[in-house]
A protein has these predicted regions:
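N-terminal cap/lid subdomain of alpha/beta-hydrolase-fold enzymes
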Residues: 26-37, 78-192, 498
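A catalytic-pocket lid/entrance helix-loop region that shapes and gates access to the active site
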Residues: 140-144, 241-340
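Alpha/beta-hydrolase active-site loop
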Residues: 166, 176, 193-211
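Alpha/beta-hydrolase fold nucleophile elbow
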Residues: 216-227
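Alpha/beta-hydrolase fold catalytic core
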Residues: 324-481, 486-487
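Short alpha-helix in the alpha/beta-hydrolase fold that links the catalytic acid
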Residues: 475, 489-499
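Catalytic histidine neighborhood in serine/cysteine hydrolases
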Residues: 502-519
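Catalytic histidine-centered segment of alpha/beta-hydrolase-like enzymes
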Residues: 518-527
């Protein structure tokens, strides 16, 4: 879902074991100032805790080593030649911003680095931890949640994940700066990391540092980002190639958004742009089909969606382009057709000028029953907080499973990974931050490759992914989308892939998969099984 993802600390090789053991000896400090200094020192020093485990995936027993820790990443523009200030007090007064980025890595035991792929996994947000991908999709253990309804309160059940891709690749779950057990410290720390470009730079530096510290430069390398994580992946893939000299084997995208002008969320603020309505229509249709709100219910979803996609690109696009010049007859015909495809009332559609945002659709489809549909997964629904509001006040899908994920990971991290209880930090308690709550502070400013200056407004990272593909023509891309995703509609992702500024022959490097699920494709167990198979096949055919 939000997309973001990973976990904490790691010290130089000769100090790793010492860090894990001596931190407890340094911890409980009676003086508040000393305690704060100890915690600050702890946060700005790489940490590392190692544990062992095993999981059976598709009948294959896989013993693994789990490494949980943090790496320290400096704000963009930092130069390591500046290390060693002559006045420690001056540094203490006004230290540069740094991010302690939390991660959890799983390494298959006995595998040789050059033959063993490694995949860096994260969610989006922006400002989300990787708890969603970690506990719901790819980790060796996953949380069990209800399929399309609210998961009952604790106790929750954690099971071995038969669909983890650990059978094909080592996994590194990365939590975005300011999330997980990671923290930001220093001057202007939020400004230094809460933005499209500084966030991508932090991930780029983290990955390069991780490859060095763990000796994985010669391993086949992959990115897997969800939601805003796909935005990040496009930039990071390009920066790894152009700034670090690191070619990737593949980039896997889940619930993609690369051009925010295509978003159906805030489309009303850009009234001259109709494309988001066109690209969201198939997801509206899939949602109405799932809830049996269509005037005539088609039997086959995929056949139905092909018909809707054709209408969206032809008659619907034509009607929207007419604007206020549309004839009464064409307005009526288009509204009637939209009614057949969405289940929304004809008069409502006409009153909306044939233009319905994602939030308005989620509010209206089940509105007569006093229910809102989910945004991230429209299979879900929940009682409307305000039945008279124009858009929902909450996302029923997110509310349905947040507690399960958060509870499961906190228990798993502390009791299985043995992380988050170091006495050096706040008397032994560390909060796992699922979100940095940074969206309101986020600088959506992005400098595209070759641009003279950053562009303000909604980011468009299609040029970044295209640049990565041009620099490395063997780079393969895999797009995964859920039919019931109103946050990043699946047809939008297809459109973006078809409009990358790349030579046509490079388009063959892209493969696309859809699933009968939502934004968090893996929340639907059969879809998770499909996702595993597609990921493993993609990795196996793109290295060696």
């Amino acid at each position: 879902m939000r997309s973001g993802i990973l976990i904490r600390s790691f010290l130089a090789v000769s100090l790793l074991a010492a860090t894990c053991l001596t931190a407890h000896a340094e911890a409980p400090v009676s003086d508040n100032v000393k305690q704060a200094e100890t915690a600050s020192q702890f946060l700005t020093t790489p940490q590392k805790v190692v544990s062992d485990g095993a999981v059976t995936i598709r009948g294959q027993h896989i013993p693994y080593q789990a490494v949980t820790g943090t790496l320290i990443v400096h704000a963009r523009g930092w130069d390591d030649s500046d290390i060693g200030p002559s006045d420690p007090k001056a540094e203490k007064k006004n230290p540069d911003a740094v991010a302690s980025i939390f991660y959890v890595a799983y390494f298959k035991k006995g595998a040789h680095a050059e033959n063993r792929p490694i995949t860096f996994v994260y969610n989006g947000g922006p400002g989300s931890s990787s708890v969603w991908m970690h506990m719901g999709a790819f980790g060796p253990h996953r949380i069990v949640t209800a399929d399309d309804s609210h998961t009952a309160a604790a106790p929750y059940k954690l099971i071995d994940n038969n669909d983890s891709p650990l059978d094909a690749t080592d996994l590194v779950f990365i939590d975005a700066p300011g999330t997980g057990f990671g923290r930001l410290v220093g001057k202007d720390k939020e400004k230094a990391f809460y933005g499209t470009d500084p966030d991508a730079a932090a991930f780029t530096d983290f990955i390069a540092q991780f490859l060095t510290r763990f000796g994985r430069y010669n391993s086949p390398k992959y990115l897997f980002g969800e939601s805003y994580g796909t935005t990040r992946s496009a930039i990071v893939a390009n920066q790894l190639a152009s700034e670090k000299g690191i070619d990737l084997n593949g980039v896997m995208l889940l619930s993609q958004i690369l051009d925010y002008d295509n978003s159906i969320d805030n489309v009303k603020s850009n009234p001259s742009v109709d494309q988001p309505y066109v690209l969201a229509l198939p997801s509206f249709a899939a949602t109405a089909w799932y809830h049996h709100k269509l005037p005539a219910q088609p039997k086959d979803l995929k056949t139905f969606l092909s018909e809707v996609e054709h209408f969206a690109l032809t008659d619907y696009t034509s009607a929207l382009q007419d604007g206020t010049a549309i004839s009464d007859e064409k307005l009526e015909q288009t509204a009637q057709k939209l009614h057949q495809y969405t289940g929304l009332p004809v008069e409502y559609l006409k009153k909306a000028d044939l233009r319905v945002s994602g939030g308005e659709f989620a509010k209206t489809l089940l509105g007569d029953d006093g229910m809102d549909t989910g945004r991230l997964d429209s299979r879900f629904s929940g009682p409307a907080i305000d039945p008279l509001a124009q858009t929902p006040d909450y996302d029923p899908q997110f509310a349905a499973m947040q507690s399960a994920y958060v509870s499961a990971f906190n228990d798993y991290a502390r009791n299985t990974l043995h992380y988050g209880t170091n006495p050096a930090f706040n008397d032994g308690y560390e909060e796992y931050k699922v979100s940095a709550h940074s969206i309101g502070k986020w600088a959506f400013v992005h400098k595209q490759p070759g641009a003279g200056r950053p562009a303000k407004g909604a980011p468009n990272v299609l040029p970044d992914l295209a640049s990565a593909m041009k620099q490395n023509p063997s780079l393969k891309i895999m797009l995964n989308q859920g039919y019931y995703d109103l946050g990043t509609p699946f047809f939008e992702g297809i459109y973006e892939m078809q409009h990358l500024p790349i030579p046509r022959k490079l388009a063959s490097n892209i493969e696309i998969h859809q699933y009968e699920s939502g934004h968090m494709v893996y929340a639907h167990a059969p879809a998770l099984t499909e996702l595993h198979d597609n990921v493993v096949n993609f990795i196996n055919k793109t290295h060696g």
